[in-house]
Amino acid sequence: EFLFARTMIGVFKNIEYMCNRTSSKTWGKEAWKKIVVCIVSDGRAKINTRTRAVLAGLGVYQDGIAKQQVNGKDVTAHIYEYTTQVGLELKGTQVSLKPRSATPVQLLFCLKEKNQKKINSHRWFFQAFGRVLDPNICVLIDAGTKPGKDSIYQLWKAFDLEPMCGGACGEIKVMLDHGKKLYNPLIAT
């Protein structure tokens, strides 16, 4: 759950950054209405119970209502949505909820019934949500990756400045505790 929380904290900070760009023609105070954070989890039996608790705390998951079958037909996925004003805080690996007075965040959570691996989750994202949301750009972030405070904005900007751009990627840096250095070059890469 702390890896998921680390990613979500970074995403929340990026949304706040875009909302604070008050002189922007695209972004600004209401920017959060243009952003939907889609979370896809691969398999109901596989999801970490503490991660489920974090999602419930954010308001985008309800425990106990998902069923394997409805009217005799197998369920493929469970979809939850919520606009949250709850934030997350990390102290070491301890995740806690905290009220956020500023920027709401629109969340869409897809809990796949079966574990069908990462590529299938990407397919779900593009084929199911992409068709409905019709986004200008999509940013895929693995749980545990912490985006910098403006990195999602910088990716958006790359697409905005070059409409023929079909893909972009950001830089990933190793997260180290303060005062720690990597002396082994194999680990550093």
Swiss-Prot record:
Keyword Acetylation: no
Keyword entries, A-Z: Cell membrane, Cell wall biogenesis/degradation, Glycosyltransferase, Membrane, Transferase, Transmembrane
Presence of keyword Transferase: yes
Reactions catalysed according to its record: [(1->4)-N-acetyl-beta-D-glucosaminyl](n) + UDP-N-acetyl-alpha-D-glucosamine = [(1->4)-N-acetyl-beta-D-glucosaminyl](n+1) + UDP + H(+)
Any Pfam family: Chitin_synth_1
EC number of the protein: 2.4.1.16
Subcellular localization(s) per the UniProt record: Cell membrane
BP GO annotations: cell wall organization; chitin biosynthetic process
UniProt xrefs under InterPro entries: Chitin_synth, Chitin_synth_fun
EC class: transferase
Membrane protein topology class: Multi-pass membrane protein
GO cellular component: cell septum; plasma membrane
Molecular functions (GO terms): chitin synthase activity
Main location: membrane
Main function: Polymerizes chitin, a structural polymer of the cell wall and septum, by transferring the sugar moiety of UDP-GlcNAc to the non-reducing end of the growing chitin polymer.
PANTHER family attached to this UniProt entry: CHITIN SYNTHASE, CHITIN SYNTHASE 1
Sequence similarity: Belongs to the chitin synthase family.
Protein name: Chitin synthase 1
Organism of derivation: Exophiala exophialae (Black yeast-like fungus)
High-level lineage: Eukaryota, Fungi, Dikarya, Ascomycota, Pezizomycotina
